[in-house]
Every structure is written in C-alpha cells, then in structure tokens.
Amino acid sequence: MVPIRPALAPWPRHLLRCVLLLGGLRLGHPADSAAALLEPDVFLIFSQGMQGCLEAQGVQVRVTPVCNASLPAQRWKWVSRNRLFNLGATQCLGTGWPVTNTTVSLGMYECDREALSLRWQCRTLGDQLSLLLGARASNASKPGTLERGDQTRSGHWNIYGSEEDLCARPYYEVYTIQGNSHGKPCTIPFKYDNQWFHGCTSTGREDGHLWCATTQDYGKDERWGFCPIKSNDCETFWDKDQLTDSCYQFNFQSTLSWREAWASCEQQGADLLSITEIHEQTYINGLLTGYSSTLWIGLNDLDTSGGWQWSDNSPLKYLNWESDQPDNPGEENCGVIRTESSGGWQNHDCSIALPYVCKKKPNATVEPIQPDRWTNVKVECDPSWQPFQGHCYRLQAEKRSWQESKRACLRGGGDLLSIHSMAELEFITKQIKQEVEELWIGLNDLKLQMNFEWSDGSLVSFTHWHPFEPNNFRDSLEDCVTIWGPEGRWNDSPCNQSLPSICKKAGRLSQGAAEEDHGCRKGWTWHSPSCYWLGEDQVIYSDARRLCTDHGSQLVTITNRFEQAFVSSLIYNWEGEYFWTALQDLNSTGSFRWLSGDEVIYTHWNRDQPGYRRGGCVALATGSAMGLWEVKNCTSFRARYICRQSLGTPVTPELPGPDPTPSLTGSCPQGWVSDPKLRHCYKVFSSERLQEKKSWIQALGVCRELGAQLLSLASYEEEHFVAHMLNKIFGESEPESHEQHWFWIGLNRRDPREGHSWRWSDGLGFSYHNFARSRHDDDDIRGCAVLDLASLQWVPMQCQTQLDWICKIPRGVDVREPDIGRQGRLEWVRFQEAEYKFFEHHSSWAQAQRICTWFQADLTSVHSQAELDFLGQNLQKLSSDQEQHWWIGLHTLESDGRFRWTDGSIINFISWAPGKPRPIGKDKKCVYMTARQEDWGDQRCHTALPYICKRSNSSGETQPQDLPPSALGGCPSGWNQFLNKCFRIQGQDPQDRVKWSEAQFSCEQQEAQLVTIANPLEQAFITASLPNVTFDLWIGLHASQRDFQWIEQEPLLYTNWAPGEPSGPSPAPSGTKPTSCAVILHSPSAHFTGRWDDRSCTEETHGFICQKGTDPSLSPSPAATPPAPGAELSYLNHTFRLLQKPLRWKDALLLCESRNASLAHVPDPYTQAFLTQAARGLQTPLWIGLASEEGSRRYSWLSEEPLNYVSWQDEEPQHSGGCAYVDVDGTWRTTSCDTKLQGAVCGVSRGPPPRRINYRGSCPQGLADSSWIPFREHCYSFHMEVLLGHKEALQRCQKAGGTVLSILDEMENVFVWEHLQTAEAQSRGAWLGMNFNPKGGTLVWQDNTAVNYSNWGPPGLGPSMLSHNSCYWIQSSSGLWRPGACTNITMGVVCKLPRVEENSFLPSAALPESPVALVVVLTAVLLLLALMTAALILYRRRQSAERGSFEGARYSRSSHSGPAEATEKNILVSDMEMNEQQE
C-alpha cells in the first residue's frame, strides 16, 4: 500500500464537497506561487507589435501593456500534447468553434477538452495570436517552398525579458517510476482532488514524494507513478553496492523502449546500467535472483562510426554475451540482460518495450566529465623511441604474433601499447601508427574469457572499438586486440595473426623538466600544430575577433574530435562561462562556416542546437555541457574567447581528412540525378508497399550496400535541388496532399555518448540546418530526422518508423553491385509464368530479400509440386552439399507468428521437413528449402544462406474480391443466410463430430458441401457466428498432393491461416486421398479464433460447416447482407451505428457523441469480424475509437479499455500521433487523424457516454417541447415530423429562442445531414435560415452574416434564384442545398441556438408560488443544513483520529506486475478505508 494523507469515507467526503462548494469553498492545495517563479519552463508571452504580455482574464485572453512576472495570469508553460497552460487560470489556451462565420473565439478552456483546438505548434503560435487578437499577421511563406533567411515566423511574439522565441522553453516527457502505469510519462496538467496540477506534486502524500498522474483525470482512472528526481543520495528507489558505492534501480514494472529508458535514467541523474567488472556482474545477478525478466542495459552500438559501448562512457572491457550473441548487429543495436541466462547479455531491436536498470554514483549527478590530460612533460627516450606525456613509444614494423610482439617489447624494457585517453590515442594515430593499416596493442582477454585487460597491468579506463566490435570474443582464437583504420578504432582478432605492433615504456625525467612549449609564447598552450590562448575578458563577438587579431592569431577552429577534447580541457575549470569560436552564420542562411571560409567537417552541438533561428555565432559551453557548441547573438551576448595561432608546418602529421572532394564533371549512375553545380548524385527510394519501407538503420544499410550514404545536406543550394527532385517525382500540389510523407535523411542523434547532438551519418559536419519549428513531447526519443515533403523542412522522428528514404553518392562512383559470386550472375531461368535467379553467396534473410528487390523481384514463393521440383533440380546442380539450405520467401513477423510469402501470394502449398516448423515464439522466423529433399525448415533469419529470387509480370498479391451477387432467395430453417449462400454449423452434440470425409458425406446428404471461403467478408460472417461454438470445425479445404484446394476444385483465392500454420503432417507427393484437411479454430486465444489450421483428415474428429446456395423459392433473411449505414446494429452485448460520410477522426467522434455514442471499441475477434462485414459491405475504411497520443506510437481506446486484442495489418501501427481505422480487409491501419475517410463506426452507450470533446455551457432540457442535441458550440432541435412553410419555421424557432438552421462549415453540414438522413421518410429536407440581401447582393444568414460556406447541389445556384422570393433548404438524402419557393411548399424544421450556462435555462420566478411547495422547500433546506453540520463534525473527528498513522513509501522490485499493480492501484488508499473494510 502506498500511504497518504487521510481520506474521508465515501459518503461524508462527497457530502462535504457539496457543502463546501455551496459555501464558495473547495478542497485542495493552492500552488506555491513563490516556488513557481523559479520554474525554468514558465514564461511570459510578449507581443512586439502590441507592446504587452498575454494574460488570461477569466475565460478570455487579452494583451496587457503591464508585464508582471509574479502575476500567475501572465505565466504560461508548454504541457503535454502541445498545449499551453496558464498558471493563473489553471486552464489551457484554445479556440472555440465560431459563433458566427467570421469570428473564432480565443480563450481559456479546461485542459481535458480533448480537441485539436487546444493544441498549438510553437512555430505558428505567434502568427495565430496576432490573427486571433486582431493584430497584423506575420508574413507567411508560400506553402511548399523552402524558407530562406530568418525562420522566426513568430517574430512578433517572444518570451518576455529575453530574445528567446516561443519554442525556446519546450515540454519534455517525464517518465514515471513505480506506481501502476508501467513507466508511462506523466500527463501534464492532470486533475487530482478537483484541482489541476501543472507539474509533479507531493499533495496527498505524507512522505513528501513527488508523483503525477499518467492520464488526464486521476480521480477517474487512478493511473499514476512517482516522478524522477536528481539527488545526490541513493535512498528511495535505489539498491546500493557498499563495496563499489554504485547504486542500482530495477524498473521491473516499466515497459519502455531503450531510448525512453535511457531518458528515464537521465532524468534521475543516472544512466542505464553499465557492467565493467566481474564483481559487478555477480552483484547484479544476486539482485536478479528470483525474477524472470529481460531488461535494458546501457550497452549499445548506436554510433554508426564506432563499436559497442556503454551509454555512461564507461570502458567496454568486460563482456557477458550469451552464445551466438550479438547477432544481426546492423539492426539490433541495444543490449539487454536476461534472468533466464543468469545475467547473460543479448542484443535486441532498440524500439521494443522492456523493463530496465539504472545506475548512478552518489554525489555525481552534475559533475562534468574530467577531461584528458594534454600537458606534455619533457622526458628522455632511447633512440628510435618517441616521447609523449611521460612515456616513450616505438613502432615495431616486423610482423609477429601477439605473444611474439609482447616478448619483443619486453626485451626492449617495455610492453605492448596501452591507451588511456583520447589525447594518447591522437598521438598514437598521428605520430606512431601513421600509414600502417593495422597493429597489435596490449589489450587481451587471455587470462579470463570476456574480461579484457592491458598486458602491462594498467587499468582499462578507455576503449575505442571499431563498428560491430568486439564481436568474436567467445572464440578462443580472438583474444587479442588490434588498432586499425584512420581513427584508430580497435578490433579483437586471433592472437596468432602476424602484424606490426607498438611498444610503450616509462620515460626518464629530464633535468629541470618542464612542459614543452614548442615555440608558443608565455601563457599560450601548445597542441600540434598550433598555440592556444584563453581570453578572459567577456566581450561581444566582433571584439573577440579583433582581440585575437591583435595577438597575431584567429578565433579557434575545431576540425576533429581530438582537437575538441583538447579545447575542452583548456576550459574545464571555467564553470558557467562561454567561449567564442570562429564558427558563425553571419549571413543568416542557416549555413555555418568558419571565419577562414573552410567547410565544417566536424561539429559538437549541445542539445537542441543550433536551434531554429537563422544567424548567430557559436560559443563553447562549460560545466555539465563541457565543450558543447551553442549559438549566441553575435552583437549582444558577451563571452570569453579562445585564440589559435598556427605555427606553420605541423610538428606531427595530420590525421587523414574526410573523403576526397568529388569531381563536378563525374557522371551519375543510371537512375540517379544531380545538378551541374553539385558534386553528388541522388536517388529517392519510395514505395507504396509497406513491406519495402525501412527503419532509419535499415535505410542506412541499403544506401551503404550501394556504395552510397543516406542523404546529408551541406547548403541551401543542395537542399533546393533535392526539393526540386521531389516535386518532380511527386508533384507540386498543396502541402496537405503530401502530409506525413517523410523521407529518411542521414541526420541522427542516436549515439548516447554524444548527448543529444545531431550528426550526419556520413561524417559531414552538421553546419546547415532546416528544422521545422515544431516540438514534440517525446523529442528525447526522436533520434533520427526526416525530410517532410509537405513543408520541405526537417522533422525529428523515432528511428524505428518504416519510411521512404533518399541516398547520395559521389559523382563518378559506380553503384556497388551486390557481392553475389560467380553463380549468382547467371541469367534468369524461366519456368511457367515466372523467372528465377539463384544466388550462391550467403546473406541473411532480410539482406537476401533486399537484393531481390533490386531486380524487381522477391524471395521465391512456391505454389505447386512442379514448381518445387523445378527449384530442387536447379539447387542440386548448384549445391556441392546436397543438404545445403537456401532461403525462400516464407516468413513470420514478430507481431503475430503467421506465415506469409514476401510477394503477398497466398499459402496453398507446403513441404515441411519432419519436425518442422518449430513451435511459434516471439522471434521472427524465416524458411529455407534443401536441395536434395526439397523440404522446408525454419531458423533464425540472421543466418547467412544462399537464396532464390523470383519475379513475374503478374503480382502475386491477391486483391480483395468483389462482393458476391446478392441473389434472390432464402435458406431453409436451421440455416443462416449470407448474401447468396446458406451456412449451417454442425457438431454441437459431441456424437456428431466426425472425420473430414464423413463431414463431407453428411453435407452431401443435405444437398450441400463443406464450406468454401472465398474472401474476407465470408470469413468475417463465419467468425462472427462462433461466439458460442466450443469446438473446431472442418471446412472444404484439403491437400492430397501437398497443394491445398477446395472441394469441387474451386480456385483458392483467400486464406486465413493461424500463427505457425499450415504445419500439419505434410501430404505425400503422390496420392489422391486427402491427408491434410483444414479446420476453423474456436480457440479461446483471440489471435487464433476463426483462423485455419491443417489437421489429419483421417485421425481427428471435429464439427463442420455445410454450405449451399440460396433457394429462389424462399424469402431472403433480413440479415443476409452486410450492415447498412444509419440504423442501429446489435451484436452480442454491443450496439453500433455506421456512419458513411467524409469525416476526419475528430469529426467522427463529434458525430458519434451527437448520437449518444462514441467511436467503437473492438474487444475481441468476434466483434472485429462483425465490423469487418460493415467495412467490406460499405467498401470503405471506417474510423474506430483507437488513437495514439500526440507524437506517440502508443495506441489506446477512447473507452480506456486495455488493448488486449489487436488486428493490425503487417508493420502497423505506423503513425506517431495517428488514428486507427478498420480497412475493407478487416485489418487495422493507421493514418493522420486529419485524413478524411468515408465512414466510421460508433459504439452506442447504454447511458450517457463520456464526452471526450467538451464545450462550455449545455443545451436546454425540454425547452419549447423539444429535445436539443449538442454539437460543438450549439444546440439543435430536429422536427422532421412537423412540415411547415418557411415563415412558420422562422416563428417556431424564434419562439424557442433560436434561429432556423444555419450551416457554417463542412463538418456542421455532415452533422445535420447525418441526422436528417434517418428521417428521410418523414421529410425530403429541412429549411435553411438563409435569405437574399439585395443591398449587398449576397446570401446572408438570419443574423445578417454572409454565407461563406455552401454545399449547393447540381446545377448550382443560378441568378434567378437570388431574390427575396427565394428560400433555401437542405436535402435529407444527400446533404446538398437546394433553392426553392418560400410558399406552397413545406419542409421539416431544425432550430439552432448557442449553448449557454445551465442556470440560464431557469425561469425567472425561481421560488414556488404554492405555500405547500414553499414548506417542502424550506424543510429540505433545514435538513440539508443539519447534514452539513454532521458531515463537518464527522470529518474533523476522523481527521484528528487518523493523522500520522501511515507507513512511508517503499521501493518495490516485484517480479510480477500483478500484485504490485494491485498494491499500487490507488494512491489514495488510507488506513481509515482499510479499517472500514475490515469492519
């Protein structure tokens, strides 16, 4: 139990709240305004144009000329879901729907009003404020074009008292710990005890721990968690190892991605777990004892230029990989520790959600990392040895094994090289190693496997592994380490390999030893090949340039990570200061250049830098952001500075620079394009097929396999060409048509050791930027960048999203052919309607499929014995080993375990080897075939095998079949009709369950046959008929010669196999009797219900489904066709209503709520099947009540039911912040919530549904004998049964205090149409409150506002209908508007009035006139007062009796979420309530 302050028992608590509200009081804890002033994320919004600050005044908003930072009504902060919260009003800024067609109301609204009108983009907020508050709007750029110059489109508005724009104080997700929300982020603000909290709070807790709710309203959902805090101790929530002084936090109950887990640890001043010693591994294993879990640790391979590393910068010297790990390092870049393998490590896909372990050292939460020592004390060395920092070094050019190299070093008085810092690595790389490709160093794990140590016995404090290394540490042949490549990266290698080596030994201290100055002036510090000096005066940028020039030098330039490390060491002791560099964007183009004009080849930006503004000069930060680069105002910001003076010829050779500059005259490969002014060629990889889209790391791999890189952009000119290329391919239509069409580019911040700094994957310096000025709550986990086709700007994105991408290759470079070997280059071999190519070179399954797609092919599918024999004959010719495995296209996904072919064709043929396939599990499976036996097996997809590609002119994908004809006729009693077929389920009595052939015979006796299922619609009908079936059912699908077919040889066009199926006994290659037959599963597992499985035809008995055609002599059943829109539909315990209108997701929700419903919840496969019939019958996708929060891929139901059953299409959900719909094939897909679909499904509530979109005021009850329906800001009364003339309609609505219907936008028209459509039989239409104004020559509504939206039906509105004698109406069947005469015709009536406060509906004479009634009222009042007094007395007594009797919160490491979740369910459980339960 998590204890808290006392809570009242339910009835006195609610009564007391009523009493206090009546008395003008409220329960709660007022915020501490003094503390709020210190909040760094709170700000005032200042208007440059109006010279004032934005202030909340009640429900209104105004600009006041007096800015007051202590006034809560002027204090704002960004909160969850891109909302703007006011501390004084404790509400969110929003817009209401227009009361007239010309005004939109800007005001303060309750933050739980789930509407897009509360969400703002910081980049456009200023423009919208100017527009809505009546000021002159900022000039906006033309849509679809690139912006140049200053990107600050909100320049009229900024944060008061600074030059910061409105994007400068963003909101970041805060991940909870413990509680009952599985680590889900806080929802800010949240409501607790009828009070809004805009941050974490200790309210309600006696122990003072900060907590937050993870849904909007704690009182309703009771979902919560503790907030992360940075502290210098390890008291609450941490386990401490007394031996090492390290602290550990095990978050077993959380489920986060690796990057989310890393962010959660960072928010506590910690990092993900690193394990650097055997003792530490043993200690962790002890804490894991008794638990069953897989947890994230800090091990990662996210640096595309480096190898495995710890996220906290610890050296990677101890390893505990499980056998065969790491595998697939190209795509699975994050490490886990597993209890099942006694603490063994595996690498996983970083995007999956898992528990995690944090680690920290006490008193080390904000200390900057100690820099390397760069001073060079003068020492004496023997001839041929070179000095550096007190040691001597020598290259041994003779190639020897590692052991022989070590002995040679020992003979010289030294040992093999040990490296302890970036400074030492730079010296070795630049001066000793030089042009030698690979050399031995002293690192090895010869003494103890997986534990690397230096041969000279020194401590391993620094590692610098090569990409994908260390990788073969398990193999005893790879126990020794080499240094190789221009950056000096390390690789583990066999110790018997013959290589040169480097020796190291201590130098002899010279007499009067002093630091070498290499000719630098006094006070200057040398670092090859320059002298450096710190200017201690704080000056603006131009003065810093002048002062360096006066000293015969320039402001410092930084060209590689070694120079960066050196400069950071110079400024280490200057806490809180900034130092100018030579980097600047003086022309405000968004492109940074060194003052020398040199290209920027290395960058080291701080978080959120270089920001959104154009222009500025770059300074180095200090403190916890030591050495990181930030953009500052060149003319107003004051900083210290660093001068650099070159000594001319470098004392030591320079490091190799970036790749040579490509030629302008080189040609581009076929299919690649360029511009005469650019040195690279470009290619867009885009596909409509979701399977061919890639994650960021997959897209990078594809580009690199071609010898190219993911797109990097160094200038506006280069990006302008890319934009032109995209417009040429996809068209220059309005941005809306390109919405959410994104392309991966090479920009990323995946590497945790770089903090949150953006880098190009090809090593190009990040010197040009074009980020869209948008913010997302989860920006911490958006580690990769995309180019947005709509805005042609960049947007951060989660790296695992599957998208298109763009590659870039230097001019004159040929696209690299895949290394496919000699036999792989054979011509394509034709068989029947397809061509096949056999590749003998070995690849993983995914890489093999990727190579096939380069030839417009897929890994082969197999659909007949003849095709299998053809493949087997060719494989026997190519395979020296007849048992060789070859990849084919059959595979499963991790999400559901169902087999599918890569080309989308159906599974109608199997050839499994005995014992295959293996039972389904969580891992993806891929299928191979053997050469001699021609049988299939499954194994891990990362295994490298040869493979077969197949291509054909006809697509293998089966298209959804058209609806069968709805033939006349019906079905006999006991049969269920659907379209033109009759179905009957048999086997309810166990004695009626028979073998397959007996089932077919039984059907034939009834003039029927076993069912054939031709499409998803028929499958949905059958699945929807299964809720009460408790046994499996034979269908007409069977296999006699390995290929499945229907009875009567009907073509097999559709299959619905269960996960891991078909896997039954493989039919014999020859024979006529069926040996494998299919059943429909009744399984209690939702993922198997209604799916197919293959069973032995002769050994098993089951129920069965018979099918026959309808009888023309019988009447059709009412349920014979798919559901139609409009009417209410009942299924099981649910009631639905189908909408068939063009709707956005929010519009659909509004429309459902106007029908006392909400968007539908799909709890099980039966309901899913029923809704599939609806979508298939309407031939249109339908919105459902499933959506994700802004910027998140976590999807949840509007009803807040758990997401236990899903029916996602492959690779879904795709969209962050998207909404879900049921497609015509029954699967769920996601898209932007602003997409217009042609329909939706409402789930009708038994009681009033919870309204997700709330508006001020309410509608009258029974006013003017009418029922009023709320919709947005208005109320509507529909009287289609009353047919009146236009004049009478006006009078009727005026009597009710409203007006005849006006329609101001498309959504309102859809709402009205939806309600008129159900009353089409009563009236053909309803009057519109519109007339012609001859003075202005325009149509106006009753309030004389112009008609700006219209929906005229053909042929439109002619001039003859624009007269005062014309009246206008809306047609019930179509929603179209029609003109007509005002007299002699009658229509239905729809009245409309604005919502008003509830007490506005009370009659003015509120007191009863009857004396008897008056006595009753007075008696009730006296009774209420007596109850109020009793409640107050009871409250005070219980409060004093229970105060102080609670235990403090405990840190719980539960191995099962169930008990802990029950314990942590409600933070408001008190001892009083427990005592009451015991009584």
Curated annotation (Swiss-Prot):
Enumerate the subcellular locations listed in this protein's record, separating them with semicolons: Membrane
Tissues where this protein is expressed: Highly expressed in heart, lung and kidney, but little or no expression in brain, thymus or adult liver. Expressed at highly endothelialized sites such as those in choroid plexus and kidney glomerulai as well as in chondrocytes in cartilaginous regions of the embryo.
Q: Name one GO cellular component term.
A: cell surface
What spans does the record annotate as topological domain Cytoplasmic, numbered to this chain?
Answer: 1435-1479
Q: How does it sit in the membrane?
A: Single-pass type I membrane protein
Q: List residues of the Fibronectin type-II domain.
A: 181-229
Limits of the C-type lectin domain: 243-359, 388-504, 527-643, 677-808, 831-950, 978-1106, 1131-1242, 1271-1391
> Phenotype on deletion?
Mice show impaired mammary tumor growth. Tumors from mice lacking Mrc2 display an abrogation of cellular collagen uptake, a fibrotic state characterized by the accumulation of both basement membrane and interstitial collagens, and an overall tumor size reduction, despite the collagen accumulation. Fibroblasts from mice lacking Mrc2 display a severe impairment of internalization of collagen IV and V and thus, exhibit a general deficiency in uptake and delivery of collagens to vesicular compartments.
Q: List, in alphabetical order, the Gene Ontology terms for molecular function in this entry.
A: carbohydrate binding; collagen binding
Q: Region Disordered: what ranges? A: 1446-1479
UniProt-listed InterPro entries: C-type_lectin-like, C-type_lectin-like/link_sf, C-type_lectin/snaclec_domain, C-type_lectin_CS, CD209-like_CTLD, CTDL_fold, FN_type2_dom, FN_type2_sf
Where's the Glycyl lysine isopeptide (Lys-Gly) (interchain with G-Cter in SUMO1) crosslink? 1141
Q: Mind telling me which Gene3D superfamilies this protein's record contains?
A: 2.80.10.50, Fibronectin, type II, collagen-binding, Mannose-Binding Protein A, subunit A
Q: Which GO terms describe its biological process?
A: collagen catabolic process; endocytosis
Q: Which PANTHER family does the protein's record reference?
A: MANNOSE, PHOSPHOLIPASE, LECTIN RECEPTOR RELATED (PTHR22803)
Please quote what the entry notes about the protein's domains: C-type lectin domains 3 to 8 are not required for calcium-dependent binding of mannose, fucose and N-acetylglucosamine. C-type lectin domain 2 is responsible for sugar-binding in a calcium-dependent manner.
Its biological purpose is as follows: May play a role as endocytotic lectin receptor displaying calcium-dependent lectin activity. Internalizes glycosylated ligands from the extracellular space for release in an endosomal compartment via clathrin-mediated endocytosis. May be involved in plasminogen activation system controlling the extracellular level of PLAUR/PLAU, and thus may regulate protease activity at the cell surface. May contribute to cellular uptake, remodeling and degradation of extracellular collagen matrices. May participate in remodeling of extracellular matrix cooperating with the matrix metalloproteinases (MMPs).
Q: What is this protein called?
A: C-type mannose receptor 2
Give the gene symbol.
Mrc2
